[in-house]
Structure formats: C-alpha cells, structure tokens
Amino acid sequence: MNKINKSIATALLFGLVSVACIAQDDDGPAGFSYVTYHYCDVATQGAMDAAIETNEKAVFDKWVADGKLIAWGYLSHNTGGRWRRAQYHVSPTMADALNNQAAIFAEIYADNDAGGQARSAACAAHDDYIWALNQGSGAGTDRGDVSLSVYYVCDINREDRADEIVAETSGPRLNQMQEDGMIASWGWQSHRIGGRYRRLQTITGADHASVVQARGELFQYMNENHSELAEEFTDICGSHTDYLWDIVHEAP
C-alpha cells in the first residue's frame, strides 16, 4: 500500500499531486481521489452545506481517524464554471475509492431518508471523477485556504507526454515557488474515471489573488525558459477550465 499523509493527499487533490514526483512504495500513483462535483441552485446550495456539516462531516472525520480513508474534504465555488460544490475522499487504490464511496454514504443515510432527499434536492446533478495522485508537494506541506484548480482536456494518446513536461518544467518551478512562500502547495493528477477532463493542476495559497498571481508568474516562467515545451504541452492539452475553490472542510 502506498503511504500518503494529509499534506500529500490534500495538496495533490486541490492544492488537489515533490520534488517533481512524490516518493512512493512503487511506480504507481500515491493515492486515488474520488471527487463529486455538484451542480447546485445558488438559492439551495446552502442546504448542501448544511447536510455536509450536520450529517456527513463527523462520519468522514471518523473514517479518516480510523484509517479507512486517507483524507477527505469539501469545497465551495468562488469563481469558475458550473460546479458549485466539490466533495472528495482519498484512498490507497482505485478499488478502495469506489468501495468507500458506496460504503460511507450507506452508513450515513441508511436510516436518514429525509436527509438524503434534502441533500439531493439541494444539488440535483453531479459529475464523478477518480483522479490518480501523481506529482506535487511533498511530505510536511500544509496547503492554503483556497485552491486554483485547472481542468485540462488533453489528447488521450499523448497525455503521458504532458505529464513528462510538467515533471521537467513547471513542477520544479512550482517547488521553488512553494519554497519561496509564493504558494502553499501544488499538485498534478491524472484521470482514471469520469468526464472529459484528463488532467488536473492545483495550486493552493492564502487567498484567491495570490494563487492567480502565482499561475501568471508560472506562465511567464514557461514562456521565457521553456517556450518550445510550453507549446508542445498546449498542443496536447489545448483546452482547460479554471476554478477557484474555498476549502470549507478537510481532514486530517
């Protein structure tokens, strides 16, 4: 089993994925995050927040404390696309991620039909993804209060090359930005199950302005120092959607 602590799991996911690669027990991903991205009516999304706080938070916290989950968290939309809320949990394998998704909600709502119905009414549609945690901030990293998440649409036949470019260019630069205090953490993750997005880059920091500034400085660095590789990356992953998330709950 890969060993992964809070700083790795959460930094990878919204922060989540160094050095340019996390130390692992083998060559596989450090973990797998099951993420549910919710479409909510802005008039009712507060009911989802209440359901998480009242019905789910204590159970998720206990699962983490008991070692059933590596980490979990809940995020609120600030800026970006149509997703309004995101909830995630991290497991050591993809099979565990799938099984834990079913088991924990069965535990929470088995005897609370009304709570489950209220939750569904608050956010009536969602997208599920499983992300493999591949590159990002290493052990001992505390992530920030907000996350800039960039969801990339990539050529499935060449996306592994995009991973190599990140490891060679932007990854080391993000490590330096973290050491310099410009960002709190960063991550790079790959699609395993879900919709059209194939890669996810995350940067966390103290506030929205700082993570946006950091991304702008990363663009400038790439254009000035790795312009050909930056063009190659854009050719592989030519479309993306940006989100700014506020981190509402997380454990450990």
Name each model-derived stretch.
Residues 22-111, 117-252:
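Short S/T/G/P-rich N-terminal loop/turn motif that feeds into the first structured element of a domain
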Residues 9-18:
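Bacterial N-terminal signal peptides
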Residues 2, 20-22:
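Glycine-centered signal
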